[in-house]
Amino acid sequence: LAEFKAQIRLEITPDGLQIQIVDDQNRPMFDVGSALVKVYMRDILREIGSALNGVENKISLDGHTDASPYGSGERGYSNWELSSDRANASRRELVAAGMPDDKLARVTGMASSYLLEPQNPLSPVNRRISILVMTREAEERLLGRARTPLDATTQTAAAPAIAASGATKR
C-alpha cells in the first residue's frame, strides 16, 4: 500500500481503523451520477482488498455522494441508491482482489449524510468510499452478539411512545 499513501487517509476511531480513499490530485472515485469505479481507483481498492486478506476483523464499507441532488429525486433513483451502488461496486473490486465476501459485515449507502468536506458539499472528494476495519466490539454491536437489555426506565418511557405511534409487533 506504500505506493498509494498519498491517496489513503487512516484514522483510528472507537469502532476501528477508518480508511478513506481520496485521490492525491482531488479526482473523484466516481463520476457524477455514476457507480462505475474510476480506473485509477480500481488499483487502490484491489490493493486494499489484498491487504485486508491478512486481517481477521470484519469490514464495513460505506458509499458516499456529494450533496448535488440526483436526477429523479425523492420518488426515484436518488443519492441513497447511488451511494449504495457505489459501495457495492467497491465491494466487487475488493472481492476481485481475493478478499473473501464473508469478511464484509455491512455494505451501506450514506448519500451525502457524511461529507468529507462539509464546507464544500459539492466537492468531488465527497464522492468516495469509506472502509472500516472493525474492532471486535464494533462487530459484536453490529451483528447483535453483545446485546444488552434496555433498562426498565428506558423500556417504560419508550412503551407509550411506541404504542401511540401505532406500531405493532410482527
Which role does the model predict for each range below?
Residues 22, 29-40, 44, 55, ...:
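Periplasmic OmpA-like peptidoglycan-binding domain that tethers envelope proteins to the cell wall
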